């Protein structure tokens, strides 16, 4: 782990469509609807540096880190995924922020391949092998986003904490680790949401969700019905978070939703 350097002002800034500044550490190649920015403010002293092959920035409670691997450096995409998550767990433990709350995974050609050779299923298999060696106490909230083009890069961004969160299930949906075999040799490993409290307040980190009921997408071809189903899924997670918190949680000013 490289010695951290101090930074001021911003823990993380997601800049959609805005031209990257020269000093920006992490960029993701995705098309956007319009220019905007999502800014995460720090709590306490900021520092940044390197964790092996990953860059990080952290404050007194949270750390954001970014790892990029090329599948050309490994036997196949499953092995690339396994190595990414092996490093993620090693780096998180070494950093002093061992509790991984949220992960964003980006790679191209996500549905390429037939059956268990599909790239998304290969990604899940590699991730599972890494986590069998070093399980998370709680599976983090997570999203897998397909990027355009033919990139060989697997990019993993994660948010971690010095204190654990509480993983949440959605009773309207099958728990990911119990998905039936038709979704691959290894089911996906994530929680539907993660609830976390700290000195800065509380966070509800919701995984990528869709018009999913049980384990199947519904309302194929009907965008309005799909959006309504997504809203019901988010409402269900807000109820679960309220049960953990001990009082109801609603849509608050400043809540951020990303649409892919």
Summary of predicted features, one role per range:
Residues 1-260:
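N-terminal presequence-like segments and the immediate start of the first folded domain
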């Amino acid at each position: 782990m490289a010695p951290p350097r101090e930074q001021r002002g911003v823990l993380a800034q997601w800049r959609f469509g805005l031209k990257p500044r020269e000093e920006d550490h992490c960029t993701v190649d995705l098309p956007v609807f319009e220019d905007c920015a999502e800014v995460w403010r720090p709590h306490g002293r900021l520092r940044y540096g390197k964790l092996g092959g990953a860059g990080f920035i952290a404050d007194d409670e949270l750390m954001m880190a970014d790892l990029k691997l090329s599948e050309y450096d490994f036997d196949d995409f499953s092995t690339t995924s396994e190595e990414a998550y092996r490093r993620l767990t090693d780096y998180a433990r070494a950093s002093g922020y061992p509790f991984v709350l949220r992960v964003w995974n980006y790679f191209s050609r996500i549905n390429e391949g037939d059956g268990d050779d599909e790239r998304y299923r290969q990604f899940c298999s590699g991730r599972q092998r890494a986590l069998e060696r070093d399980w998370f106490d709680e599976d983090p909230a997570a999203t897998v986003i397909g990027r355009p083009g033919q990139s060989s890069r697997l990019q993993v961004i994660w948010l971690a904490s010095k204190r654990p969160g509480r993983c949440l299930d959605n009773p309207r949906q099958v728990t990911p680790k119990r998905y039936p075999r038709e979704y691959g040799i290894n089911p996906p490993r994530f929680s539907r949401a993660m609830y976390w409290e700290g000195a800065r307040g509380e966070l509800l980190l919701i995984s990528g969700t869709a018009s999913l009921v049980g384990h199947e997408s519904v309302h194929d071809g009907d965008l309005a019905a799909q959006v309504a189903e997504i809203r019901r899924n988010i409402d269900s997670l807000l109820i679960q978070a309220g049960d953990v918190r001990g009082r109801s949680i609603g849509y608050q000013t400043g809540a951020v939703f990303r649409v892919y």
